[in-house]
Amino acid sequence: GTNASMRKAFNYQEVSKTAGKNCANCAQFIPGASASAAGACKVIPGDSQIQPTGYCDAYIVKK
């Protein structure tokens, strides 16, 4: 499922508009079964459709 209210609060985008910044390289992202599969996010609970290509205001580069 998705968490529409939290997505809106963090201005989540399915495809990042910022080069080099996306869910796949964010510390908050919980990867799915493969590199291109949808995953989850530590700051958007109850959402299993977070795209690795996505981006939101909670982005923190993975160290």
From Swiss-Prot:
InterPro entries: High_potential_FeS_prot, HIPIP_sf. Transmembrane segments: none annotated. It holds the Pfam family HIPIP. GO terms for molecular function: 4 iron, 4 sulfur cluster binding; electron transfer activity; metal ion binding. It comes from the Bacteria. [4Fe-4S] cluster binds at C23, C26, C41, C56. One of its GO terms (biological process) is aerobic electron transport chain. Keywords: 4Fe-4S, Electron transport, Iron, Iron-sulfur, Metal-binding, Transport. Homodimer. Specific class of high-redox-potential 4Fe-4S ferredoxins. Functions in anaerobic electron transport in most purple and in some other photosynthetic bacteria and in at least one genus (Paracoccus) of halophilic, denitrifying bacteria. Belongs to the high-potential iron-sulfur protein (HiPIP) family. This is High-potential iron-sulfur protein. It comes from Rhodocyclus tenuis (Rhodospirillum tenue). The gene is hip.
